[in-house]
C-alpha cells in the first residue's frame, strides 16, 4: 500500500501548471502526509479543471459511518470490480500531486523508511478516484496502487500509480471509458525513481517537517541501508 507521501509547495505549483490549473491551491509544504490528511486533488477536464482540498481515505457513498470506512488505497487489479470503487472509477477520477512517497523496509523487527522521488523531470501525478463529501465534509479519495517498480520491489511489493503527462490528461478526461484507462495503471519504468534511506522521524505521523527527508545517519539509523539494498 501507499501510506505516506510528501508534497512540496513548488512541486504542487509545477504540476498544476502542467495540468492547466489556473487557480493555485493554498497549501504549505508537508513532508509526512498520511491517510485522513487534507491535501490538494486535481479533477475535471480542461479548461474547467480545478484543484480542490480533499481528504485522503475514500468513503464509499453507502458507508454508514464515514470515519470508520475510509479506504486509502485501491488496487489496480481489482478497482474496476470492487463495489466501493467501481462508480468512482467510471465517473470520478483524479490526480493527486506528490513530490515523492515513503515505504518501509522491515529489518530485524525494525521499520526503516525509504523515500522515493523522481530522479529528474516533473513531480508525481498519482492516479486516484474520489467521492463527493456532500454536506458531511470535503471530497474523499483513494490512491490507486500497482506492483512495485524495480527500485521499490526489494522493499515492498506495491507502489502508487504515477501517471506520465499524457496519461494524466487521459485519466482526467471524463469522456474516456474506464476500461480503456486500466492499461495506464502500471509501474514506472526502471530508473525513474531515486531511493534514499531517511530518518526514522518519519515513522511518527506527528512529525511533518523537512527533517523527515534527512538521510539516515548514525548507527541507530543504519546509514549503510542503501548499500545493503543495492539502490545507490
Indicate residue ranges for each PLM-predicted region.
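Short linear sequence motif anchored by a di-proline
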Residues: 1-232
Amino acid at each position: 500500500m501507499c501510506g505516506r507521501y510528501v508534497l512540496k509547495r513548488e512541486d504542487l505549483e509545477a504540476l498544476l501548471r502542467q495540468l492547466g490549473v489556473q487557480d493555485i491551491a493554498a497549501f504549505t509544504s508537508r513532508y509526512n502526509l498520511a491517510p485522513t490528511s487534507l491535501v490538494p486533488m486535481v479533477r475535471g477536464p480542461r479548461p474547467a479543471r480545478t484543484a480542490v482540498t480533499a481528504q485522503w481515505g475514500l468513503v464509499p457513498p453507502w458507508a454508514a459511518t464515514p470515519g470508520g470506512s475510509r479506504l486509502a488505497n485501491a488496487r489496480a487489479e481489482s478497482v474496476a470490480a470492487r463495489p466501493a470503487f467501481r462508480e468512482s472509477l467510471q465517473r470520478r477520477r483524479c490526480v493527486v500531486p506528490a513530490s515523492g512517497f515513503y515505504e518501509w523496509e522491515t529489518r530485524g523487527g525494525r521499520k526503516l523508511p525509504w523515500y522515493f522521488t523522481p530522479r529528474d523531470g516533473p513531480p508525481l501525478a498519482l492516479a486516484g478516484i474520489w467521492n463527493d463529501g456532500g454536506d458531511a465534509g470535503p471530497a474523499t479519495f483513494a490512491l490507486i496502487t500497482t506492483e512495485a517498480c524495480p527500485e521499490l520491489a526489494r522493499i515492498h511489493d506495491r507502489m502508487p500509480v504515477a501517471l506520465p503527462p499524457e496519461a494524466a490528461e487521459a485519466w482526467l478526461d471524463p469522456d474516456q471509458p474506464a476500461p480503456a484507462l486500466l492499461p495506464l495503471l502500471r509501474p514506472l519504468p526502471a530508473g525513474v525513481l531515486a531511493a534514499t534511506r531517511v530518518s526514522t522521524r518519519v515513522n511518527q505521523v506527528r512529525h511533518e517537517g523537512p527533517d523527515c527527508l534527512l538521510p539516515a545517519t548514525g548507527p541507530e539509523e543504519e546509514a549503510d541501508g542503501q548499500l545493503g539494498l543495492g539502490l545507490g
